[in-house]
A protein has these predicted regions:
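Conserved active-site neighborhood of the chymotrypsin/trypsin-like protease fold
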Residues: 76-80, 87-165, 241-243
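C-terminal motif of bacterial Sec signal peptides marking the signal peptidase cleavage site
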Residues: 21-24
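Catalytic nucleophile loop of clan PA
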Residues: 84, 192-212
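N-terminal export and membrane-targeting signals
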Residues: 1-15
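Gly/Ser-enriched beta-turn/beta-hairpin loop segments
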Residues: 60-63, 117-131, 162, 173-188, ...
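A conserved glycine-rich beta-strand in the N-terminal activation segment of trypsin-fold
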Residues: 53-57, 66-88, 94, 113-115, ...
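Flexible, gly/ser-rich surface segments that form the specificity/activation loops bordering the active-site cleft
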Residues: 138-184, 194-197, 214-222
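C-terminal cap/linker of serine protease catalytic domains
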Residues: 26-60, 209-248
Length: 248
């Protein structure tokens, strides 16, 4: 879901649209049964906080404040993606969002630019960590475990590199990760995502992180790296390598 201006239009529908980048697609095996065939992606909704005590002085909820827009200025062009804070100076996003970058530009919900100090990407999963010198305005809690089929899910990100949106849906199943089979299962949700949504946080009904958006299927479903995988990768000191400079 990295939105890019350096590639052509998305090709004909395939089983998986890798990263949801404009023109960045890969032909992969169809998702295995059973997966409901009558799921319709939900439309974008306006986030309505559950309680006024969660609002910041500027009127934005903590869930909105933790999401960031990531601009990848690479040797070959410009692309955009999303990310979210997990502590005051650490962001989670996708590996393909930050790959081949010359400069990473991070901005918050209110347009504030944050200086990036370092970035690293996971060797196996489509995950990356970005460190910022400037403090991030908010970060969410992590859920106690992975969600189950039927659980509510919201995706918070910056589709097309534009305004912050929150889309709602539910977990509709699981599948073997079509890109990284050794990592086991990933989650399938019908919450709507678009190019630029890669790296968005997927949240449960209580606003806790349950996964990371990384790809979209040709029938409009979204794939999530589950929380358990994210936690396992973050706990492995050897799982990440420093982001190499792009090649010109």
């Amino acid at each position: 879901m990295r939105s890019s201006v350096r590639r052509g239009a998305i090709a004909a529908p395939v089983a998986l649209v890798l990263g949801l980048g404009v023109g960045a697609c890969g032909v992969l095996p169809e998702l295995p049964d059973p997966v409901p065939s009558d799921i319709v992606p939900s439309r974008a909704v306006t986030f309505a906080p559950q309680g006024g005590e969660q609002l910041s002085p500027d009127g934005f909820d903590a869930v909105q404040r933790m999401a960031v827009r990531i601009r990848n200025v690479g040797c070959a062009g410009l692309s955009t993606g999303s990310g979210f804070a997990i502590d005051e100076h650490t962001l989670i996003t996708n590996r393909h969002v930050v790959a081949d970058s010359e400069t990473l530009e991070v901005s918050t919900y209110d347009g504030q630019d944050l200086e990036v100090s370092a970035a690293s990407s996971a060797r196996l999963a489509d995950l990356a960590v970005v460190r910022t010198l400037d403090a991030l305005p908010s970060y969410p809690e992590l859920a106690v475990g992975d969600p189950r089929t039927g659980d509510a899910v919201s995706v918070v990100g910056y589709p097309e590199g534009g305004e912050l949106t929150v889309t709602a849906g539910e977990i509709v199943g699981t599948t073997t990760d079509p890109l990284h089979e050794n990592l086991g299962e990933v989650l399938i949700t019908d919450a709507a995502v678009e190019p630029g949504s890669s790296g968005s946080a997927a949240l449960d009904a209580d606003g806790r992180v349950i996964g990371v958006v990384y790809a979209k299927t040709s029938d409009g479903r979204s794939l999530l790296v589950p929380l358990s995988t994210l936690q396992d990768v973050l706990a492995d000191a050897d799982a990440f390598t420093a982001l190499p400079p792009c090649s010109s």
